[in-house]
């Protein structure tokens, strides 16, 4: 069997430009799943189990989070996602399922290559770089966001240039403070590079990221029990009234698919099946 194609149990693994992409399930619709901090493709284990009877689920661990380059520029990430989409679904556009930093990278890919994306399911990150979001935060919320993100960016920097052990300890401490459900043993400071891109311009930075204006249908699911939101009320209200789109708030924190798996997966299945959701925008 070629190195770029192998199987493990019920999963098929292909390698695209040095990145392993794992496929599982059946169906003509291909759902490409992108995680964020501080996760890996394992974030989607439950979601794959819930959807694999109706679609083919494809997932990867973002470059640099476990192995590979220390940081991936935005242009390179979009190019990689295009290569993956072309490989796993050459004849039809994919459905994106996104969380956290996966939303930022996935949104950018969808806006640059709309012909390759049929629709999007996004979790907990909306108009992340809009003026409306910044204006919606109180001073305390702005300081909270800057505080945790700069801490993680610093942990990445220290891990790269001073001590990996120190960087890892700082990262795991912040994950505990944020009540992250990910196994601490799997969390490392490598996973923090998007924060260094955001604040310090690492690997070209993220100032080139477009405002979030998707041309395809979008289901946006978010946790309502958080000290701050990553969407503006203006963006949420507009999305809730847009044809083909839906908004669903669930009583939990940032990791919606882990905190409220049954409700999340039922919502996603219904929307993918074309059912009208009882939209909840809080």
Language-model segments: which ranges?
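The conserved beta1-alpha1 loop
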Residues: 32-36, 99, 222-223
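Conserved beta-strand->loop/alpha-helix structural units within folded catalytic cores of enzymes
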Residues: 37, 98-106, 258-261
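Flexible "cap/lid" subdomain of the alpha/beta-hydrolase fold that forms the substrate-access gate
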Residues: 43, 58, 63-95, 104-248, ...
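An N-terminal hydrophobic leader/cap segment in hydrolases
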Residues: 1-12
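C-terminal alpha-helix
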Residues: 84-88, 267-278
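Catalytic histidine-centered segment of alpha/beta-hydrolase-like enzymes
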Residues: 252-261, 265
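A short loop-to-beta-strand scaffold at the N-terminal edge of the catalytic core in hydrolase folds
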Residues: 14-24
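Conserved HGGG/HGGXW glycine-rich cap/lid loop of the alpha/beta-hydrolase fold
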Residues: 24-67
């Amino acid at each position: 069997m070629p190195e770029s194609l192998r199987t493990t149990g019920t999963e098929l693994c292909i390698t695209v430009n040095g990145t392993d992409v794992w496929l599982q399930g059946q169906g003509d619709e291909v759902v490409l799943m992108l995680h964020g901090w501080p996760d890996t493709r394992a974030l989607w284990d439950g979601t794959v189990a819930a959807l694999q009877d109706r679609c083919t689920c494809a997932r990867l661990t973002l470059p640099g989070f476990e192995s590979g380059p220390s940081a991936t520029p935005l242009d390179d990430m979009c190019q990689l996602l295009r290569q993956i989409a072309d490989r796993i679904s050459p004849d039809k556009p994919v459905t994106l399922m996104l969380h956290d930093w996966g939303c930022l990278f996935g949104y950018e890919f969808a806006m640059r290559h709309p012909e390759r994306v049929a629709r999007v399911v996004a979790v907990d990150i909306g108009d992340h770089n809009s003026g409306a979001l910044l204006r919606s935060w109180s001073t305390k919320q702005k300081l909270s966001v800057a505080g945790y993100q700069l801490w993680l960016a610093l942990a990445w920097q220290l891990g790269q240039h001073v001590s990996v052990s120190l960087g890892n300890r700082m990262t795991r401490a912040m994950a505990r403070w944020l009540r992250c459900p990910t196994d601490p043993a799997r969390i490392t400071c490598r996973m923090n590079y998007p924060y260094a891109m955001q604040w310090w311009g690492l690997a070209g930075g993220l100032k080139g990221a477009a405002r979030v204006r998707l041309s395809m249908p979008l289901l946006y699911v978010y946790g309502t029990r958080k000290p701050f939101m990553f969407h503006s009320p203006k963006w949420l209200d507009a999305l809730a009234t847009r044809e083909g789109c839906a908004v669903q708030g669930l009583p939990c924190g940032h990791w919606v698919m882990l905190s409220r798996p049954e409700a999340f997966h039922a919502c996603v299945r219904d929307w993918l099946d074309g059912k009208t959701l009882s939209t909840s925008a809080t």
